[in-house]
Design a protein with these regions (language model features):
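Conserved ASCE/P-loop NTPase catalytic core
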Residues: 2-150, 154-163
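Phosphate-sensing "switch" segment of ASCE/P-loop ATPases
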Residues: 31-33, 38-41, 45-48, 122, ...
Length: 289
């Protein structure tokens, strides 16, 4: 799992950049959803003329298709945990170019907040979620292992600043699990001159190569990966010796900087996770390539 947070002011093209980065995923999700809608209509048609008893038998022998969506802009932990526990999803993403929608949403307010933060932390660390129901509703209880969740939130400085000052979001380790980026604001330089007008993202060879790779990885056809160990259906990519040495030096550098009077003395929750986050990001890049 990766939790990503990006700062960008209103008008900084947050939506444009995210749509460009997620283009292949969005198109894939749309195709899958159209197939799901057709399957659902067929399923409904199959039981439309049946009586109640036959309809129950039909539903038992032909369960309805599941919504294949994995991208969400606003979903509660309770809902996403249910999708994991029920085996509908193994991977999901909460992505929004309005981070205020998440930080100001139902999950982050009221009595459920601390429980949700703990759940997100557990999901990040162990890929584990648990749902417990009352004895009268045991069918709703269950666990899911080795699941993944990606946060990809973008928001204005004012929104992220308030979140980063929140002692609960910091103290419970929720925000320290995020990778924060603050890209340069290009406002004032984005002139639509002749050079700009001659460019087309859809014909840029770099973007085409990126989208093509995304499409390949999204393809459901199995790809042999015999050189990597499988762990519950997920590939484990080991670090070579050079990577281990780089990781060790990186870890020790950040550990020393957490000492008294050092740069990260008061940011230990963030600094202590730097090495882990770097390993996760490197693994995603290695797998993508």
């Amino acid at each position: 799992s990766l939790y990503l947070l990006t700062e960008g002011q209103s008008g900084s093209r947050k939506s444009t950049s995210r749509n460009m980065a997620d283009k292949a995923i969005i198109q894939h999700e749309r195709k899958q959803y159209e197939l799901y809608r057709r399957s659902l209509e067929q399923w409904k048609s199959g039981q439309a003329s049946l009586n109640k008893k036959d309809r129950e038998t039909y539903s038992a022998e032909n369960p309805p298709p599941h919504d294949p969506s994995t991208l969400y802009s606003d979903i509660t932990l309770e809902s996403i945990a249910g999708l994991y526990v029920d085996g509908i999803l193994n991977n999901a993403s909460i992505a929004s170019d309005e981070a205020a929608q998440f930080f100001g949403g139902h999950t982050m307010k009221g009595d459920t907040r601390n429980q949700a933060l703990g759940g997100y932390a557990k999901l990040f660390d162990d890929g584990f979620v648990e749902r417990t129901r009352s004895k009268s509703n045991l069918n709703g209880s269950g666990r899911a292992y080795d699941v993944r969740l990606t946060f990809n939130l973008q928001g204005q400085h004012e929104v992220l600043s308030e979140a980063l000052k929140d002692p609960v979001l910091r103290g419970q380790g929720f925000l320290p699990r995020f990778i924060l980026t603050v890209p340069e604001n290009l406002a004032g330089t984005r002139l639509q001159d002749a050079i700009y007008q001659s460019k087309n993202a859809n014909t840029d060879h770099r973007l085409i190569a990126y989208w093509t790779r995304c499409e390949y990885l999204l393809d459901d056809c199995p790809r042999p990966q015999v050189e990597h160990e499988l762990n519950n259906g997920r590939y484990v990519i080991p670090m070579n010796e050079d990577a281990r040495q780089i990781d060790l030096a990186f870890y020790n550098m950040f550990e020393e900087l957490q000492g008294k009077g050092k740069r990260y003395e008061y940011l230990q929750a963030f600094a202590s996770r730097a090495s882990q986050l770097a390993r996760r990001l490197a693994t995603v890049f290695a797998y993508f390539e």
